[in-house]
């Protein structure tokens, strides 16, 4: 009796990752290095990798742990310019990492995930994607493993402060800082005392 080989052939695993920030890059590197017979695609809404370090541009934006602890063990950087590296330097490190290990070919930029659901019958995920700026062109991709690596602070919103809607000046959130904003010579009020406000305040005073 000849046995069918089907049960002994490894099943190709399809993986979809949402987010090409520091976690998405780490996961991608682990998968292509350690797992055989896998296809993986990372989708990111931005035009480049880096996640929060590609988006945050507020004055003084930097990591709040020593730079040498904020890097990949498989791509150490001994040349950080300061103890707490600023956002631009961290982004350069992430981009150079993606280039060095040829990871960009697995990433599709300018694509937003609008939803996902589990297909119980076929035991697979349906992931819904949309090209940025094209709300009429939603596609669905199927995968066996669906990984969300978008971070926790991506969807910012302004606080609910009485009178904010009638304020005559400009209202800016640090997570949506305008590129090239000139704040010199202006009266600036900073609301909050977390990490971003502390970094921002110190730089605004310069």
Kindly give the residue locations of the regions a language model identified.
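Extreme N-terminal leader/targeting segments of oxidoreductases
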Residues: 1-15, 33-38, 123, 139, ...
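N-terminal Rossmann-like FAD-binding beta1-loop-alpha1 element of flavoenzymes
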Residues: 10-42, 197-205
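Phosphate-coordination loops involved in phosphoryl transfer and adenosine-cofactor binding
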Residues: 12, 110, 185
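Conserved acidic residues
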Residues: 14, 144, 186
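General small-molecule cofactor/ligand-binding pocket signal
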Residues: 41, 106-110, 172-173
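Glycine-rich active-site loop/strand segments that organize a redox cofactor
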Residues: 45-96
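Glycine-rich dinucleotide-binding loop and its adjacent helix/turn
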Residues: 72, 76-80, 86, 90, ...
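Feature captures the FAD/FMN-dependent oxidoreductase FAD-binding
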Residues: 81-153
């Amino acid at each position: 009796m000849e046995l069918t080989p089907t049960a002994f052939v490894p099943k190709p695993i399809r993986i979809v990752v949402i987010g090409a920030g520091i976690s998405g890059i780490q996961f991608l590197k682990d998968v292509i290095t350690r797992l055989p017979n896998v296809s993986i695609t990372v989708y990111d809404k931005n035009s480049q990798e880096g996640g929060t370090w590609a988006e945050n541009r507020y004055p003084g934006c930097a990591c709040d742990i020593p730079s040498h602890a904020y890097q990949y063990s498989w791509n150490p950087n001994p040349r950080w310019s300061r103890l707490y590296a600023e956002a631009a330097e961290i982004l350069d490190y992430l981009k150079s990492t993606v280039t060095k290990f040829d990871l960009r070919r697995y990433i599709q930029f300018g694509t937003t995930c609008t939803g996902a659901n589990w297909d119980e019958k076929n035991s697979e995920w349906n992931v819904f994607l949309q090209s940025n700026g094209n709300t009429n062109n939603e596609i669905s991709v199927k995968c066996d493993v669906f990984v969300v690596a978008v971070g926790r602070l991506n969807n910012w919103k302004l606080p609910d402060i009485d009178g904010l809607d009638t304020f005559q000046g400009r209202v800016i959130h640090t997570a949506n800082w305008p590129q090239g904003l000139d704040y010199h010579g202006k009266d600036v009020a900073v609301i909050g005392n977390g990490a971003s406000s502390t970094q921002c305040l110190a730089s605004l005073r310069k």
